[in-house]
């Protein structure tokens, strides 16, 4: 289906998460819509190095969240998160219980429990989940947006042979031997037979792409029966896959993936290297800003500069009080000496300086 009308260009966005990631989803959604273009004429295609010609139209973002165990209270807070953007965005929840869970049985049990089973495999089913869409963007929720996502929706238009648009995974930065050592250890932890992987399969995963951000050509998925191909592969090799859906995509469809610039999925480890360039999505691939005491060389994740962007967006969502309540409970439980040790003084000072400066601007403008 063509999702553009003379009045509106629809851009569908998909994410999947459970109740533990609802707060992260709120921050991801708020930051995404804060930077999102509202008209096709406003889209900046420079990150893609493309010059797409689009019809003039207002952009409407239709967000679909596949949820597992997310409470009604959390759902209401997510809906409130979108209220400032209600003129050009909508939110729909899809309960995971409405889907067929049988494909989870194809996975290694430990991997399924660790990575969410159907919550990650669902990205292989987007073409059948959304039969009325020709394309869709899928994002992880451990993210914060610093730029406009709209350009990615049109990334595949100039190459109709490509099935997906994705950013290369961090594995590609490792020497191949070091990568294989890491994967062998990972397989051992999950009791997976490492020898089941061919050299070619390992090379594809090594030079493969990350599922944290992707744009999918759903028409191409349907025309070529790629969903059936993916599920058949899952039946025969699913128990070998340590990162289930990502390994599958890279092992089976690697040649059909368009490489997107790292700006669309900039891993937190590379933040300092790429900021303040055109970072569009910052991805906390290891340490999550909302987790309690995730340490990195003795420091907490909120010590990291990039977490400041996440916090600034959190303060604009209905989940901010939940975050502070949890931090205070942690202090009572003596997991931290004080809230100050969790978010360093400079982060707090910078935030309040930013707020005070904005308040003063408004005051002087009124006077």
Regions found by a protein language model. Name each.
Residues 1-367:
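Glycosyltransferase catalytic domains, chiefly GT-A lineage
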